Regions:
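A polyanion-binding, active-site-adjacent surface
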Residues: 1-189
C-alpha cells in the first residue's frame, strides 16, 4: 500500500464507534518523505471540522514554534494524531479506539520512516515513548527506540492554558533543531 492508498483507506474507516460522530477523518498533513513526524493524541473540534491536524488557536501556536526552527507543515515535516477521529466532547480516546487506530499510525510510520518523532502532549508521549512518561519533567529529552529518536513536548493547547510553560516548549524546539542537524539528511535542504 502506498501513501495515497493508505490515506484513501483511512478516510473510510469504520473500525470503532468514533466514525459515527466524526465530520472528517484527520489523516494528517505534510511531506510523506519527512524525516520528522509530529504526533498528537487526537483531533479536536476544529480539526474534525476541517479534516486537518492542529488547526485553530493551538495549531497557530504550534506553527509559530515550527517556523522558529525552520519547519513547515507543507515542506519538511508530517503531522498527525494517534486517533484519527475526534472523540466526543474531546474526551480521552478509549482503549478500543486507540487499538482500532494504531494500525493506521503504524502504516504511516512504515511509509514515512521518520528519523525523529515528536509527541505533542502527555498522552501521545505515554502511548509512544513509555506509559509513565512525565511531559512536565522529561519534555525535550530524546529517547532512541529501534533507530528512531522520540521526544515528548508540551501540547500547544496546554501552553495556551498555561503560558508560563512557553519558554520550556520553545527550548524543546531548539533541541529538536539540534537533533535534526545531527541525525537527519534532508530536512533542512
Amino acid at each position: 500500500m502506498d501513501f495515497e492508498q493508505l490515506r484513501q483507506a483511512c478516510t473510510t474507516c469504520e473500525k470503532c464507534g468514533l466514525c459515527e460522530t466524526r465530520q472528517h477523518v484527520v489523516f494528517g498533513m505534510g511531506n510523506p518523505e519527512a524525516e520528522v513526524m509530529f504526533i498528537g493524541e487526537g483531533p479536536g473540534q476544529n480539526e474534525d471540522e476541517q479534516g486537518l491536524p492542529f488547526v485553530g488557536r493551538s495549531g497557530k501556536l504550534l506553527d509559530q514554534y515550527l517556523e522558529a526552527v525552520d519547519l513547515y507543515r507543507d515542506k519538511n515535516i508530517f503531522i498527525t494524531n494517534i486517533v484519527k477521529c475526534r472523540p466526543p466532547q474531546n474526551r480521552d480516546p478509549l482503549p478500543e479506539e486507540w487499538d482500532a487506530c494504531l494500525p493506521w499510525l503504524r502504516e504511516q510510520f512504515r511509509i514515512i520512516r521518520p528519523r525523529i518523532i515528536v509527541c505533542l502532549g502527555r498522552i501521545a508521549a505515554q502511548r509512544l515513548i513509555r506509559p509513565d512518561f512525565s511531559v512536565t519533567k522529561e519534555h525535550g529529552q530524546f529517547f532512541e527506540k529501534n533507530g528512531t529518536w522520540f521526544m515528548g513536548t508540551l501540547h500547544p493547547a496546554a501552553l495556551l492554558r498555561n503560558p508560563r510553560q512557553k519558554p520550556d516548549a520553545f527550548s524543546d524546539f531548539v533541541a529538536l533543531r539540534e537533533k535534526i542537524q545531527q541525525v537527519c539528511d534532508h530536512t533542512y535542504d
